[in-house]
Amino acid sequence: ASVGYLMTQNLPADIKIRVVTNSIVIAEELRKNDNISVIMLGGEMDNKGNCYDAIAIETIKRLRFDKCFLTSACISASFGLSIQKSQAISFWNAVIDSSKQAIGLYPTEKIGIDSIVSICPANRLNTLITDWDASEEDLCQFDDLGIEVVIVDKE
């Protein structure tokens, strides 16, 4: 399961929010909650149920978000957010550009390594949320870039 999907399963039961997503899987999970309004972005869907194309990007450019939550294959202080395929670069940059606050969700295994293609520098994130196993050295590098680092406790 994706990090975003796991986040949807752990939202407080009484939260009242509107969510914009490019993922049919996440939209399907969220639509089960009466207190969550879902806007599903359109466009050509990939085999994982996500839309990253020009239609989705143009829709994103017409919206404004208080917060965006994103993840990618990897993140490092030097190479930034990175992925294996370049199709999503413009989409994720449009999401960040349309957001007041960009929050990265990165478990330990995605931190401090680089994938093939950089989406953007790490300091485009305002906040990085990770788990208790993340390397202090890696986290200090993000802190030095001015990124607020939040460590989720082990439970």
Q: Which role fits each region the language model picked out?
A:
Residues 1-5:
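Gly/Ser/Thr-rich loops at beta-strand to alpha-helix junctions
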